[in-house]
Amino acid sequence: MILSFIILGILYVLFLSVLHYLGIGYIPLAIIASAMILAQWYFSDKIVLWTSGAKIVSKDDYPKLHEIIERLASKNGIPKPKVAVVNTQVPNAFATGKSPKSSLVAVTSGILNLLDDDELEAVIGHELTHIRSRDILVLTLASVFSTVAWYLAQFGFFGGIQSRNRDSAGTTVIVIVVAVVTWIVSFLIIRAISRYREYAADRGGAAMTGNPDKLADALLKISGKMNNIPTKEIESVQKLNAFFIIPALSGNSIANLFSTHPPVEKRVAKLREMKTGMGQL
């Protein structure tokens, strides 16, 4: 985890040094791109509510869900987040928000119908761990320069098309190459960080409930059910894959190769090991 951030830091310093050496005046573009990604983080709960179609629900409508979230949040010193439900048969859950004081936990109607109370509690524990660890902030900061690099590559490409000056065109090519390499390496490192955060949230959620087996059972149920959901339904929620406890992907999807989440089998194996370590066998 720390090594990933060190590599990212070195990469970004080299990237900016090359731009400075070439005398590229892309600072305004970098500022704009950074502002956009930080605004996305600041309004993350509202953006996700809008894109997911999640609806904030009251305690009267979902008493059991509210009780689980309130109890676990109080037990772990976390302010109770807003509670939302997404009307889809895809079984899943996610958390978002810029801080523990401004956060949201959402579950789908599919997961409410699939899991028993203990399994649902384990999933909620996983999501509350994301909130407690400020994972949205961590991944946002890690993503800033990768977003800047992407915009610079696009800007350099379109700027190069319009330029007829050979020197300018040569500089543009260098900028595009450096920006693309930065983006690719950042992309891979950010996914490594994300997978680490998922393992950490599994451990944290299991520790919250004291029952790693239930989270393992929930993950297996969710992934198993996902294979039986119509493709159209899966595709309708894939924009939320980075947030979901398990990405909504078909089993043979090439997207699994670049997933933000570790394979379910490995997560389950680690949870079973955690159970052994807790002396539950």
Regions found by a protein language model. Give the residues of each.
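Hydrophobic or amphipathic, alpha-helical segments that drive membrane association/targeting
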Residues: 1-94, 142-199, 223-227, 277-281
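Active-site recognition of the HExxH zinc-binding catalytic motif
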Residues: 45, 107, 122-130, 134, ...
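Active-site-flanking alpha-helical
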Residues: 52, 116, 120, 129-134, ...
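Short pre-active-site segment immediately N-terminal to the catalytic Zn-binding motif
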Residues: 57, 109-122
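Alpha-helix N-cap and coil->helix boundary residues
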Residues: 64, 119, 140, 196, ...
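Intramembrane catalytic core of multi-pass membrane enzymes that act on lipidic substrates
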Residues: 73, 78, 91-92, 105, ...
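Active-site-proximal gating segments in proteases and membrane effectors
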Residues: 78-102, 165-167, 205-281
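Catalytic Zn2+-binding segment of zinc metalloproteases
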Residues: 128-144, 156, 213
